[in-house]
Amino acid sequence: MTELLRAAIFHTPQNAFHSAAALHACADGGLVVERGKILACGDYAALRVQYPTVGVRDLTGSFILPGFIDTHIHFPQVRIVGGLGYTLLDWLDRLALPEETRFVDPAYAATIAQEFVYGLAAHGTTTALVFGAHFVEATAALFAAASSMGLRIVSGLVLADRLLRDELHTTPDRAWRDCHDLIARIAASPRLGYAVIPRFALAASDPLLEVCKALLKENASLFFTSHINESSREIETVASLFPWAKDYLDVYEKFDLVGRRSVLAHNVHATDAEIGRITERGASVAHCLCSNAALGSGIFPMRRHLERNARFAVGTDVGGGTGFGILKEALQAHLLQRLAEDPMIITPAQMLYLATRAGAEALQMDTSVGDFTPGK
């Protein structure tokens, strides 16, 4: 069925940090859609002439935006949103990790999976890169719930073998088997993708990181995501655990985990050298405004990332973040960058870009989602 949607249309088919003309806005716009694919986007009157026999859904008084894209969010942390007053490692120890141990119960995990996907959809998020659970069946429940909702999700089993609660630990051999199990389960689902996810370098031994490397080498369709440079204490701990590494990024690089399909969350305290190497390797950064503010982690050095042509998008980081709203994260980008060490003003076009196409570019999905270019 072909349909012409009439409403105000806003989207950014170009990088709004690179082009002043990136924002496409049409007060009386139209979007021609056929079987989920965009045929045309533009002025309603012109499209009505071009498609005279197509049925019209008149949404005058409303506006249409591309689906939002969340590049960093934790499925098992839905019910701990709002745990304020902590720094990162204390928050993990007191709130996040105790809650995540509950996902050993498949029934509990299935309940939260439904809450999670409804939370995404209710806030306009149609695509997300998601930290799954430490448990296979819980992560499978997330994939099933996302599929039933029609969301586009990249996720995977969260891997750790040290420094967390024992219940959350795996072994390299078990991680290898469990990841293959989940990859096979979602292989026939076009809107589901798999990410290799060591929780962060602190919680991953060299043998576990070798497993991550082997998984990525074996299957080029997989993504990689983890945390980096989120808090000063975290960085100090990584330095003590990997004394051979010149910086945090070097840990992931030594195991060949940083490439075009890699998304590194936070990067608040990155060195210029790390940002430059992220650019060279084609990786992306997930910028999590509300979480970094709520946990007192710091303000993302956006200007330094832009100066080095590093790719970045936004993530809500539920539950360190304060909710599912990607537009709220984009607004926070404007507010916090005014207060940054090297301040800058984020325009409305750039905010919309961060909430939509930037995430699509980070996930190499910009040929299918992120804006209203015909064919998407």
Task: Name these PLM-found stretches.
Residues 1-50, 62-63:
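N-terminal metal-binding scaffold of metallo-dependent hydrolase/deaminase domains
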Residues 14-28, 295-296, 302, 360-376:
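Acidic, glycine-enriched loop/beta-strand segments at the rims
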Residues 137-267:
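Metal-coordinating catalytic core of metallo-dependent amide/deamination hydrolases
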Residues 232-243, 274-279, 296-305, 322-338:
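Histidine/acidic-residue-rich catalytic or RNA/ligand-binding cores of hydrolases
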Residues 79-109, 157, 162-172, 231-259, ...:
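Active-site gating loops and adjacent loop-to-helix segments of metal-dependent hydrolytic enzymes
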Residues 32, 82-151, 175-188:
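Alpha-helical scaffold segments that flank or form the walls of functional sites
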Residues 254-261, 303-376:
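His/Asp/Glu-enriched, well-ordered alpha-helical/loop segment
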